[in-house]
């Protein structure tokens, strides 16, 4: 698959709340834990800050990423939604994840992603953690 085909698959193939409604809702992290176990728990390979809340998460995240990067830390940033390009969601030191990394992640793990019926969010979190760990 090329990059556009990969994005089409990501947005259209997997169940999303917007497409199938309440059936897509998952009240636990079991599927996320399962995909991260499959990926050898990449989130354990780096320190992280999780920013939660109703408003201001994006601004706060970008500000903290800038501060950490200016202090010399290698800084990964995962945000959503994106404005123009899916790759805006996943960055290291301000640089978006390369298109070929997106394609390669999906190609390498497509069977497992389909098997687990991951939500778009679960899949992109796994992709970000995998990218940050390398």
Predicted regions and their residues:
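Short functional linear segments
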Residues: 1-53, 60-62, 66-71, 78
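Short active-site-proximal "capping" loops at secondary-structure junctions
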Residues: 56-57, 83
């Amino acid at each position: 698959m090329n990059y556009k085909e990969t994005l089409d698959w990501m947005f259209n193939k997997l169940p999303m709340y917007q497409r199938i409604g309440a059936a897509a809702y998952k009240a636990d992290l079991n599927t996320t834990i399962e995909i991260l176990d499959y990926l050898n728990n990449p989130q354990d390979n780096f320190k992280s800050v999780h920013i939660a809340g109703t408003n201001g998460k994006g601004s706060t995240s970008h500000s903290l990423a800038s501060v950490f990067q200016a202090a010399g830390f290698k800084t990964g940033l995962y945000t959503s939604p994106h404005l123009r390009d899916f790759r805006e969601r996943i960055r290291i030191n301000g640089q978006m994840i390369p298109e070929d990394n997106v394609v390669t992640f999906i190609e390498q793990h497509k069977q497992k992603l389909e098997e687990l019926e991951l939500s778009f969010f679960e899949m992109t979190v796994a992709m970000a953690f995998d990218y940050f760990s390398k």
